[in-house]
Amino acid sequence: MFDLSKFLPVITPLMIDTAKTLCPYCGVGCGLEAVPPAQPGRATVRDREGTPIWQIRGDRQHPSSQGMVCVKGATVAESVSKSRLKYPMFRASLDDPFTEISWDEALDRLCDRIQQTQADYGKDGICFYGSGQFQTEDYYIAQKLVKGCLGTNNFDTNSRLCMSSAVSAYSLCLGSDGPPACYEDLDLADCLLIVGSNTAECHPILFNRYRKRHKQGGTNLIVVDPRCTPTAEVADLHLALKPGSDVALLNGLGWLLYQMGYVKKDFIANQTEGFEDWLAIIEDYPPQRTAELTGLAVAELVRAADLIASAQRWLSLWSMGVNQSIQGTAKATSLINLHLLTRQIGLPGCGPFSLTGQPNAMGGRETGGLAHLLPGYRKVIDPQHRADVETIWGLPMGSISPQPGRTAWQMIEGLEQGAVGFLWVAATNPAVSLPDVKRAQAALKRSPFTVLQDAYHPTETTTYAHLLLPAAQWSEKTGTMTNSERRVTLCQAFRQPPGEARADWQIFAEVGRRLGFAFDYTDAAAVFAEYVQVTAGRLCDLSGLSHELLAQAGPQQWPFPAGAEPTTESKRLYTKHHFAYADGRARFQPFHHLGVAEPPDDRYPLVLTVGRLYGHWHTQTRTGRIDKINKLHPSAFVEIHPRDADRYNISEGQAVVIRSRRGEGCFPAKVTTAISPGVLFVPMHWGALWGDRTEANALTHPAACPISGEPELKACAVQIEAASSTFTI
């Protein structure tokens, strides 16, 4: 055993001094230090309403962020006391007002409804929809309750909307989920290819780290995006491709790299399978055809290939622009194929690196937090995987269903079909974030019984809930989170939760106990201690970690098997090029270009894409309550190219109506060359609480990748026309 005494002392659960924690927003996973409102010799720090607030600063000792922090992280403490749900509330009908009730009554009603639903609908009449905002302990207890004890795999999360295509792609190509690269590779790469990610706004601290080096020279940046985002503005090469043409582009780059001879033949022969199949596919993507499919110039394609081929080490980053597509898995595997072609994986400065959107989406993947997964990167369809988990959980063989559960959108379809009788939503806001949101809202309204477990009240989803459960949130509960580079951080509680709010895992465990199962955990550390044993021997082995070790030694990357020594050095996967398939070989996974599910036509001639802004987060449940961020981004808008603005007689700031086959919205126009002709952009953060007719997802459709189940939120066909009033942007 290693000696923990050389590390920092254990941090107590409730702090009277500076506390170390993790930012609860994006997947970069920045370390934060929270300073109490009252300090000796200083006036108490208060917000505009006079409430004492903790001051937030970057943790310089955190290996992932090195003391940097963005506006969201810096202001997060301003949101924790506003509009909180403090007590359980119930109403028998959606037409009734909520009434405050006790926890005993709330849990009795919840458990009675679960049992009644099982009797009336069967086990699969129950659905649970969670979130990448969960801590790992929350995720794990939910999996044990739903998939183990209740016997249904109908547990999905909002990670289905952002990361499931990356999960599928890694699994297909490398044999398992898990990004092989780390943040240090940004410091080492000679060429960085960013596909479908506005990293500068959506993962700003990570981009700032690379940008410092990029300014010094010696590394080239290629950005693939239909918009000229702040990320693309500083690129050495911006490829403004047609929405949905990523597979064609990546296949075309493969054609060029192969013709240039940038092929590692020994590696391909000894460490991979499927190369000949890939070669047969990319033969259909010579430069001229690729240019036609993508809308790019042949010269741009050749330059991109030259920049990659001339790099000794090249790294790729991707995010929602790749994943949120009917070809999400195909796009990601097409990118991984290029790394296999060039042996740029498992080595410093290279690798295919997906950026998670949420702070613990990675932890959710490790714990099995999607409808087809089990803890430890296992799958419900694998008999041995089910048996492994049943044994660890002390359940009879056959307790876990072999049938993958309903994905997020399939839950909506289940409500429409009358097949779902009980829906439990936690830490997310599907009444804004799901595609075709008006249809989703209508389905939610049909739910016989919906539980909403959240820290805030109201949210847009409150409208569709019967039972509200108050949840403790960031700063109020202790637990762990895993960021995009597989680094696990202990997030210590340093504030008391308001009212009667409870940690999510405690709520799940109490429901399990009331239903007759053993959920006897003394604290979150005990939950984590059980969970990490489920990962022993798996690619995501965390069995050597504990809350105590993380508190004393600081954040650690996995794999971290039992007996491993703590370190701040970076870890990569597949360093010996032995991949997670049984034979140790990676797989080329080629696909043909298909385009978007809903291409533009005469009636709907434009393509709408949606995305994030720098300051806001998801549906504004937190950031909408922070003055500084609202001043930074006061309203929704639509970006339109000057050519299209002239065509439709639209001027800067004018109100416009955008319509799709599903709905419409009204936005002020922002006329800019940052968007490609024929394409519109609307930010996705505004729901009914924050604007009138500004829901981006009223326009989007639910067509999804057939492999990952991730909806194509990034492209739908729309029409636009000028309205009468004007706005100030």
From Swiss-Prot:
Gene3D superfamilies named in the record: 2.40.40.20, 3.40.50.740, ADC-like domains, Dimethylsulfoxide Reductase, domain 2
A Gene Ontology molecular function term of the record: metal ion binding
GO biological process per UniProt: denitrification pathway; nitrate assimilation
Catalytic reaction list: nitrate + a quinol = a quinone + nitrite + H2O
PROSITE patterns in UniProt: 4FE4S_MOW_BIS_MGD, MOLYBDOPTERIN_PROK_1, MOLYBDOPTERIN_PROK_3
SMART domains: Molybdop_Fe4S4
Residues annotated to bind [4Fe-4S] cluster: C23, C26, C30, C70
Pathway listed: Nitrogen metabolism; nitrate reduction (denitrification); dinitrogen from nitrate: step 1/4
4Fe-4S Mo/W bis-MGD-type domain: residues covered: 16-84
Enzyme class: oxidoreductase
Protein origin, superkingdom: Bacteria
Function recorded in the entry: Nitrate reductase is a key enzyme involved in the first step of nitrate assimilation in plants, fungi and bacteria.
PANTHER family on file: NADPH-FE(3+) OXIDOREDUCTASE SUBUNIT ALPHA, RESPIRATORY NITRATE REDUCTASE
Family listed: Belongs to the prokaryotic molybdopterin-containing oxidoreductase family. NasA/NapA/NarB subfamily.
Protein name as it appears in the record: Nitrate reductase
Gene behind this protein: narB
